[in-house]
A protein has these predicted regions:
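Glyoxalase I/VOC metalloenzyme domain signal
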Residues: 1-23, 27-47, 63-133, 140-304
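A short beta-strand-loop structural module common to alpha/beta enzyme folds
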Residues: 46-54
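Short, flexible/disordered intra-domain loops and linkers
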Residues: 54-64
Length: 304
């Protein structure tokens, strides 16, 4: 079996042509150190803390965006933890999300050309923010480097589920460094995002416009299969049946993400070492996020 088959999808980190991938999901948290420790408790190997910045149009030094991050980088995609660093629009947006609840509030889709995606979204009727060039300093084994991204964002409120964005990675080697890709829990790929919504039909139509991909029926809702990864939009009742341990804090709710792992036994052992509970759900393992990462759950599945 090839690695592409074992991971179930495209054996490539970044998209080509018209492909669109589920690139990463983001936890919004109040305490960056506690959240980083929580990732480690769950068996991930988190990257060092990084403060995000944007180029100054006037040519001065980079300006803080208002957020910083730590990540769990995977062989395919990643999990991000974001925290506030400055009083900026992005920092205030994070505060508003935290007022609802800590947890998943961001989903980023990767494309080969974020500028083209920006034009497509505007043509599809979305109110858009200006295209953003973002960067953050990273350390590599060769020395300091910069991770750079081009990001297309809709105006806040256009996608009520959270910060939905489409981006293009400019520096794959700086972002996906081999030393950060091995995790004690065997995590290999981000595979899915599940969102509870009040009106599945409305949300599915909107996500179809946002992704450029069709929605199909799934248990309790609609699912959009991307070229890598998927987004499921389900009723609160369907979400509750699948995740009875989670109380939905408010709707809409980004409540769970799927992670492909080397083995369920391996991730179960890693969670146990971290003092975290999990339950078997058929061929899956469901584990609530540690409190420092907010409200929600991981759904771990073994690579076939």
């Amino acid at each position: 079996m090839t690695r592409a088959q074992s991971l179930g999808e495209i054996d490539r980190q970044l998209p080509l042509g018209e492909e669109i991938f589920l690139d990463h999901v983001g936890h919004f948290v109040p305490d960056r150190e506690a959240a980083r420790a929580a990732l480690a408790r769950a068996g991930f190997a988190p990257t060092p803390i990084s403060i995000q910045a944007a180029p100054d149009p006037a040519g001065g030094p980079p300006r803080p965006t208002g957020t910083g991050n730590t990540t769990a980088m995977l062989a395919r995609g990643y999990v991000e933890v974001l925290f506030r660093t400055a009083d900026t629009p992005l920092g205030r947006e994070l505060d508003l999300a935290l007022a609802r609840h800590p947890g998943l509030h961001l989903a980023a889709l990767a494309v080969a050309d974020a500028a083209a995606a920006h034009r497509r979204l505007a043509a599809a009727g979305f109110r858009m923010q200006p295209l953003v060039e973002m960067q953050r300093p990273v350390e590599t084994v060769q020395g300091p480097a910069t991770a750079a991204f081009t990001i297309a964002r809709v105006v806040p409120g256009e996608m009520a589920e959270g910060r939905l964005q489409i981006l293009t990675h400019r520096t794959e080697a700086a972002v996906w460094q081999p030393r950060w890709l091995d995790h004690p829990n065997g995590a290999r790929a981000l595979t899915s995002l599940t969102i509870a919504v009040a009106d599945v039909a409305e949300a599915a139509a909107r996500y179809t416009r946002f992704t450029g991909r069709a929605a199909h029926a799934c248990e309790g809702g609609q699912v959009i299969a991307l070229d890598r990864g998927s987004i499921a939009l389900v009723t609160p009742e369907a979400f509750g049946r699948r995740f009875p341990e989670l109380a939905i804090p408010s709707l809409p709710f980004m409540g769970a993400c799927g992670i492909a792992v080397v083995s369920l036994a391996g991730v179960e052992a890693a969670l146990r070492r971290g003092g975290l509970a999990a339950r078997r759900d058929g061929e899956r393992l469901v584990a609530q996020f540690p409190e420092a990462l907010g409200i929600g759950a991981w759904v771990f599945e073994a690579i076939k």
